[in-house]
Every structure is written in C-alpha cells, then in structure tokens.
Amino acid sequence: MNGNYSAPTEVGRWQQRALIIGVVFTLLFAMGAFLDRSQFFHSYLVAYLFWTGIALGSLAILLLQHLTGGAWGLIIRRVLEAATRTIPLMAVLFIPIILGAHQIYPWTHHDEMSKTPALEEKARLYLNLPFFSGRAALYFAIWILTAYLMNKWSREQDRIADRRFTKLMRMISGPGLLLLVLTVTFASVDWAMSLNPDWFSTIYGLLFVIAWALSALAFVIAVMSFLTNREPMSRIVRPNHFQDLGKLMLAFVMLWAYFAFSQFLIVWSGNLPEEIQWYLPRLRGGWGAIAVAVVFFHFAFPFLLLLSASLKRNARKLVMLAGLIILMRFVDLFWMIAPEFSPEGFHVNWMDVVAPIAMGGLWLAVFAWQLSKRPLIPINDPQYDSVLAQAPAPAHADH
C-alpha cells in the first residue's frame, strides 16, 4: 500500500449519529401510518425517490467516470462506490411502496381505469400490480448486479495491482450506463409518471436521469468537502479537483434545465388537454410559487455562480451551493409528485418533512458504514501516480 488512506474516525461517528436520527424519525414517521395511511405512503414515495436518486445517480457517475477515464473521478470514486452499495437497502425499502400501491397509484383502482378504453388497455398490458412489481425486481437486479461488479473489481484492484480490472470496469461501463439510463427511464415512468395514468411525456424519464445524477454529484461534493478537512484527503485533494467537480455540476444543471424547459415548451406549444393537465395544478394554488423558486434556485442562481472559476475552486463556497442544489432537488421532486395528491392547492404535511429525514438517516448510516470499509483512494489505479504526483495545496486555500 502506498499510504494509509483509511477513512477518518469521524466517519464512524457520522454513521452513529445518522443511525440515531434515522431510527428516531422512523419511529415518529411510523406513527403517521396510524394517523393517516394515505398521507404516510404519499410522503414515503417522495422520500424514497429522493434517496434512491442519489444512490442510482452515483452509479451513473461511477460508470461515466470509468467510461471516459477522467482523472477527476479518482478522488471521488470511493464515495461513489459506497453510495452504490446502498442500492440493496433501497430495494428492501421499495417493499412498502408495493404494499401501499392502492393508496399511491390510481391505476390500482378498477373504477378509475375503466373510464376509457385506453386506460383499460394500459391496465391490462402494463399498469397492473404483478407486472409493476416484476419490473421493479428486474430494475433492482440490474442495478445491484452492475454495482456489485464495479465494486468487486475495484476491490480486487486494491488487492492485486492488475490493469485487467481497469479494463473490465471500462468494458462494462458503456453497456452498463446505457442499461442504467433505460431502466431509470422506465422506473420513473412506473414510480412517478404513472401517478397520472392519463398523462405521458417522452422527456420525463430523461429528466429523472439527469436530476438523479445532479443530486448524486452535489452529495459527493458535500462529502468531499467534509473529507478534505481531514487526513488522508487533506494532503491529496487540490482546488483543481473541486473545480473539475464544479464544471461537471454546471453541466448537469444546464442539462436539467434544458430537459425541463423542453418538456414545458412542447406541452405549452401543443396546448392539448391531455398534455396540459399535468402542468395546470402545478402552476396554480401556491404550487406556481414553488415552480418559480425551482427556476431561480435550481437553475438561474446556481448557473450564474458556477460560471465563476474562483467559486468552483473554493470548497467552502462550492459545498454551500451543492447544499442548495440538494435542497432544491427535493423541492423540485416534491413539486413533481405532491400535486397529484393535493391538486386543489399547495399543501405540506408534517410527514412530508419527517419521511426524508427518517429515510435519509438510515441511508446515510449505511453509506458511512460502507465508506469506512475501504481505502479512500484506489491506490492501484493506473492514474494514481499521475493524479497524485504534484504536492497538493489546501483545497480551501482559494477564495
């Protein structure tokens, strides 16, 4: 080994605190199931999609990094790998969605799907609980297998300095990324778009793909800022590493805005009743103010700030912006999902706040546990020497 790259002891304390928060808020959230069963599952779905997005977005960025061979990915690879190893947890946490499908999805109600021949055909061929559950099982099988192979070969590369593992990871990254995009697209249709079985959008799935990748990248930047203040990453990470991550975050912010605006423009220009029905409740009754906030704080504000090279090189400032993006990712997701349950106007229930904290505590505890299990740097990677050759300057030095 070329040095001690074990995770700092603070990661263990982080795990304990996250677990305590997760357990306490899970117990509080569980009480909500007895008070309002429907609201419980509505809040659960939003929280689930948010944290699953970070796990799957991390897998997407991990595959992208291996595919492109970018040196920017060496310092964040172990953070990404740890996040992908939480996917089995999300598979288990999907079970309540199946159990509560009748409270979540209108297509589980026969009277709803018998209104038109088109809806009856959808229910017969696609929107039915057995097929819905089977597709979810297939998605998770693909995601877990892909994450398992990437982590297995990375672990073997730590043990044996063999370039064969680098080639294997690159070989699977192309098909794996394509398969991930396809499965996430279908999953977003199943889990989110089918909340309104009358409505469809060909851009909706891609919007989820980009949004989840953006969530994951912002989360990675937050974790890297935490690790950079401590050994061993304090002597490895340089301002240019954060600049590379900032550039990538700017690209994802722009891509998200492009797809979101494209979908809105197509629906607005078509002005067809079956298409505008999705946007109408989201632009009225208080939801419109949320939409404006998303435009400004999810796109305009981050876009303008990320144009600054000095901000991207400053870890303190960049992590604050990453935190804002993580918050706005949840707000945007809530804006996309919640109006289906309260189309009459903006409404926030206490379970909408408790659910993401409960699930987030459990997810972060598993993430921290996985992060502490392996060295923070893949020491036998072919790019190791070139990336770490220069003596680093403190990542927070630039202002």
Feature locations, PLM:
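N-terminal regions that are enriched for targeting/export leaders
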Residues: 1-55, 124, 386, 391-399
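Long, contiguous internal "core" modules enriched in hydrophobic/ aromatic residues
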Residues: 9-31, 124-294, 311, 381-384, ...
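TerminUS-proximal long segments
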Residues: 10, 14, 115-117, 297-302, ...
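Juxtamembrane "helix-exit" motif on the non-cytosolic side of transmembrane helices
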Residues: 31-39, 190-197, 334-342
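Non-cytosolic membrane-interface motifs at loop->transmembrane helix junctions
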Residues: 41-49, 76-78, 196-209, 280, ...
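Transmembrane-helix bundle segments that line or gate the permeation/cavity pathway
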Residues: 49-159, 173-176
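Hydrophobic cores of alpha-helical transmembrane segments in multi-pass inner/ER membrane proteins
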Residues: 55-63, 91-96, 136-148, 210-225, ...
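Hydrophobic alpha-helical membrane-insertion segments
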Residues: 85-102, 251-260, 321-328
